[in-house]
């Protein structure tokens, strides 16, 4: 059951495999944040070990095949054989030292019923860092991208960066060419136009969204409807209309959420709730469309310097905000990745 660690990260797996190049036995462990005590038969503390030297074991473990085979061969001949894991077998029945790779607190084990509830919540909040794109070369050259919300802010930076990378980009927005993602027929018309002119569509990116910072009770109902129409139904419309084109190319679909998706915030309840809905939608549709070869992910930038933010929050110091160019770069990184159904965090680089 110790192998049931559904949140094991790719970093841990990579580090374990890399360690096998120099070591024949590998364990994964993390420091103990709690004091560990040893208790005697009567229930009293008999010793308090120095926790700086203690680690909590995790998985995976990895071994040279012949090493662990020989260790188990000896163990099974021992009538007193008793162990809790493979590293214990190797330590007891061989002279090979076991190298320890750093684990992660989130790499928790599913053992008790209560663990399922905690893991389910962690799965909901699971996010991913965008991968490096320095090695991708001309991967965007001759690709065709459609960007909704490409006239300003993050969308405009994505358009510019894709064009600089050699892609053919079609940009649509209400201000640019009267395309409203809240209207399904507008989305259909835009995608049809792009496909007729380019012959294919490889990427569809939707950055379109509206934010109204206002108490719910003072919001005009038409404003509420418009926000839901653009932020959430716009996402649904883009996904539905993009599906047949992206199925042909096994393409990529990108939407945008907000850091407020994990917890609603006062004075922008509609915005926060639609952003939470987008995450849930992306996770669900990623599963539905996996067989079609379509990768769908969600970019989650922290507070970003955009016209929409400035309109609602005024002028803020640049060093407290993420620049839209960094979000655009993270979006391109996500386009070249194989992940799907993920929330991609984009954070400021904080200098020490």
Regions found by a protein language model. Give the residues of each.
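Conserved core of the sugar-phosphate nucleotidyltransferase
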Residues: 7-99
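C-terminal helical subdomain
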Residues: 298, 315-352
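N-terminal Rossmann NAD(P)H-binding glycine-rich loop of SDR-like oxidoreductase domains
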Residues: 151, 159
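Active-site-adjacent segment of SDR/Rossmann-fold oxidoreductases
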Residues: 263, 284-294
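Conserved NAD(P)H cofactor-binding loop of Rossmann-fold oxidoreductase domains
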Residues: 207-213
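Active-site helix of classical SDR
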Residues: 239, 274
């Amino acid at each position: 059951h110790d192998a049931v660690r559904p949140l094991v990260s790719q970093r841990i797996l990579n580090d374990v495999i890399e360690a096998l190049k120099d070591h024949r036995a590998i364990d994964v462990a993390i420091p103990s944040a709690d004091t560990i005590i040893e208790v005697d038969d009567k229930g009293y503390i008999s010793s308090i070990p120095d926790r700086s030297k203690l680690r909590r074991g995790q998985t995976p473990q990895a071994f040279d095949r012949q090493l662990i085979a020989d260790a188990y061969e000896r163990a099974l001949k021992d009538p007193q054989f008793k162990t809790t894991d493979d590293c214990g077998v190797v330590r007891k029945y061989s002279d090979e030292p076991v190298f320890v790779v750093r684990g992660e607190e989130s790499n928790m084990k599913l053992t008790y019923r209560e663990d399922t509830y905690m893991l389910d919540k962690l799965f909901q909040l699971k996010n991913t860092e965008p991968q490096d794109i320095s090695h991708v070369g001309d991967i965007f050259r001759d690709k065709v991208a459609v960007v909704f919300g490409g006239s300003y802010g993050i969308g405009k930076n994505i358009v510019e960066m894709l064009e600089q990378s050699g892609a053919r980009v079609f940009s649509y927005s209400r201000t640019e060419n009267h395309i409203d993602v809240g209207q399904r027929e507008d989305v259909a018309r835009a995608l049809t136009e792009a496909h007729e002119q380019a012959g294919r569509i490889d990427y569809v990116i939707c950055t379109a969204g509206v934010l109204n910072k206002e108490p719910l009770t003072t919001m005009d109902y038409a404003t509420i409807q418009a926000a839901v129409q653009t932020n959430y139904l716009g996402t649904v419309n883009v996904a539905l209309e993009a599906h047949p084109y992206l199925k042909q190319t096994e393409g990529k679909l990108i939407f945008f959420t907000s850091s407020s998706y994990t917890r609603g915030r006062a004075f922008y309840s509609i915005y926060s709730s639609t952003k939470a809905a987008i995450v849930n939608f992306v996770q669900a549709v990623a599963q539905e469309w996996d067989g079609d070869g379509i990768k769908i992910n969600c970019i989650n930038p922290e507070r970003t310097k955009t016209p929409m933010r400035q309109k609602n929050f005024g002028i803020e110091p640049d060093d407290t905000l993420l620049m839209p160019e960094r979000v655009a770069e993270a979006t391109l990184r996500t386009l070249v990745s194989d992940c799907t159904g993920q929330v991609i965090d984009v954070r400021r680089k904080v200098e020490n």
